[in-house]
């Protein structure tokens, strides 16, 4: 799993739930709080020069959010007359997005403050603009400060971002006011291991049986940088594994970047999502400029606003306190809620540091070293967080057993709520979302062969593997049900109704051995592997779709 890693002060972790008040009555607060003062071990270099270019993404509020939440509940309930009546993007804009007048008021304000290239997303939930440190200070009543952070140059806002009170109910957050999240690229691999798998091995291990390939379903991968080599690797994997060549479309989000440091991550995503599915109608690769919160938020918003794919996978994350404080959590949660109402699902890696949250660069796959906190976006209510197991198969390739992978992320969200579908089985909290929702093979010691830079290598794993595997399973299920399953949360939890009775046929292997630090595997839902791992054929028979 690719992580956004950074060092934060104790104040950042302990004060995460606090909201900051407006500096003056003429201003209204947004969800973007002060980041600069909370950065530990950062050397203040003074104010960011006024002329420094700054790109911002201004996130807007969903209107009538409670009604939209209720709508999602209705369309995922087989007993409700609205069951299966998912929204189209135009329906969302007409019923739940900010009005054209509200959007124009923000656009006009940004232009009046010197911002250029002001562009509104089709769903009216985000406005991108280019400005300077000076225009940021004037428009959002906050100073950008320069820092030396872990040997790198960074900047962050010294105070909460605010907007004029006339836009207080319109603007949710101002993203792009910091770049303090530092990307680490640890390789989740071990030396050659005899139990390594290829995509088709998982069809047998996880009992695809007669469940059809995902050939009728479009899926998406969330990536960063130049993915041309990733597509070349995918073609080699398909050719050498005897798989069909899936149609690939790259959607550039923001400025193109030449970065290829995440190629192993995106190779895992593409090869093992489409490989697990056996085929898909289209594989969309959303390629953003960087994995800063601001750029990722724009990418997630694209996914919802366009509704090109039924589901997607994100093999990256960040300690959830950071997106809460910089406001991107609210922006992303809005995108995920829209996606759920439109019948779309996002799967996300739960992390590779066990029950602890990585707040500094460390050795991948080793729990500890950070606060007991979960990764975002896996912790988002409307995202399916995917944990990890160690998979053991029989000599014929069939399923033998699994135990919890000790480094798989899990725990309780301090900021996002447990969804109505999870609440009945989440005995660990009456409020916070439990992570993960499901799990798949992730241990690099039971990992996979990967085509990387034109050659097949071994052995890769992490929740960067389990998330795209889950996406591939879901593509099969969607195709089997004519793409009518909608948002996966309720369907998956309803498919696990036999848990915790081992005698009851369910759609999941209930993992009851192992742990990830603070948490231990238990019968039923737990904070190590969620509901468990997929038995695809049984789950296909257990879930229902609208007629």
What kind of feature is each model-predicted range?
Residues 390, 425, 471-474, 478-527, ...:
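An often Trp-containing, charged/polar helix-loop segment at the C-terminal end
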Residues 25-123, 128-388, 412-462, 467, ...:
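Substrate-binding/charge-relay-adjacent region of secreted/lumenal peptidase catalytic domains
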């Amino acid at each position: 799993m690719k992580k956004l890693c950074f060092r934060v002060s104790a104040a950042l972790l302990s004060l995460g739930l606090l909201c900051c008040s407006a500096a003056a009555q003429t201003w209204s607060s947004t969800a973007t709080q002060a980041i600069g003062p909370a950065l530990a071990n950062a050397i203040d270099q003074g104010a960011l020069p006024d002329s420094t270019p700054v790109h911002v993404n201004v996130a807007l509020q969903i209107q009538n959010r409670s009604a939209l939440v209720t709508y999602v509940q209705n369309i995922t309930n087989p007993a409700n007359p609205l069951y299966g009546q998912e929204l189209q993007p135009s329906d969302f804009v007409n019923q739940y997005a900010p009005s054209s007048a509200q959007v124009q008021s923000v656009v006009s304000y940004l232009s009046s403050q010197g911002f250029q290239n002001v562009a509104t997303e089709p769903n009216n939930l985000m406005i991108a603009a280019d400005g300077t440190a000076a225009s940021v200070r004037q428009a959002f009543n906050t100073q950008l400060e320069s820092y030396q952070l872990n040997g790198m140059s960074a900047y962050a806002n010294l105070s909460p971002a605010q907007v004029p009170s006339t836009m207080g109910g319109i603007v949710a957050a101002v993203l792009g006011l910091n770049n303090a999240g530092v990307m680490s690229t640890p390789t989740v691999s071990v030396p050659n291991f005899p139990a390594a798998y290829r995509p088709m091995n998982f069809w047998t291990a996880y009992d695809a049986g007669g469940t059809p390939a995902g050939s009728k379903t479009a899926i998406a991968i969330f990536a960063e940088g130049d993915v041309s080599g990733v597509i070349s690797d995918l073609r080699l994997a398909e050719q050498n594994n005897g798989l069909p060549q899936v149609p690939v479309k790259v959607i550039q989000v923001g400025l193109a970047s030449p970065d290829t440091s995440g190629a192993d991550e995106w190779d895992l995503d593409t090869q093992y999502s489409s490989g697990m599915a056996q085929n898909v109608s289209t594989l969309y690769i959303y390629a953003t400029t960087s994995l800063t919160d601001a750029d990722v938020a724009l990418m997630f918003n694209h996914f919802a606003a366009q509704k090109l794919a039924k589901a997607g996978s994100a093999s990256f994350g960040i300690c959830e306190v950071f997106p809460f404080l910089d406001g991107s959590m609210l922006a992303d949660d809005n995108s995920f809620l829209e996606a759920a109402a439109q019948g779309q699902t996002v799967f996300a890696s739960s992390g590779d540091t066990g029950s602890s949250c990585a707040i500094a660069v460390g050795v991948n796959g080793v729990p500890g070293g950070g606060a007991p906190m979960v990764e975002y976006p896996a912790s988002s209510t409307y995202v399916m967080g995917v944990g990890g197991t160690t998979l053991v198969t029989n000599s014929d390739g069939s399923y033998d057993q699994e135990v919890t992978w000790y480094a798989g992320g899990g725990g309780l969200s301090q900021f996002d709520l447990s969804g109505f579908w999870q609440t009945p089985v989440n005995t660990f909290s009456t409020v916070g979302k439990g992570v993960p929702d499901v799990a798949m093979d992730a241990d690099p010691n039971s990992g996979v062969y990967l085509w990387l830079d034109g050659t097949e290598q071994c052995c890769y794993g992490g929740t960067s593997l389990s998330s795209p595997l889950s996406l591939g399973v879901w593509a099969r299920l969607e195709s089997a049900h004519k793409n009518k399953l909608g948002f996966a949360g309720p369907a998956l939890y309803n498919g696990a109704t036999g848990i915790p009775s081992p005698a009851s046929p369910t759609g999941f292997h209930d993992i009851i051995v192992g742990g990830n630090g603070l948490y231990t595997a238990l019968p039923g839902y737990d904070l190590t592997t969620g509901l468990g791992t997929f038995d695809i054929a049984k789950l296909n028979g257990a879930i229902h779709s609208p007629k």
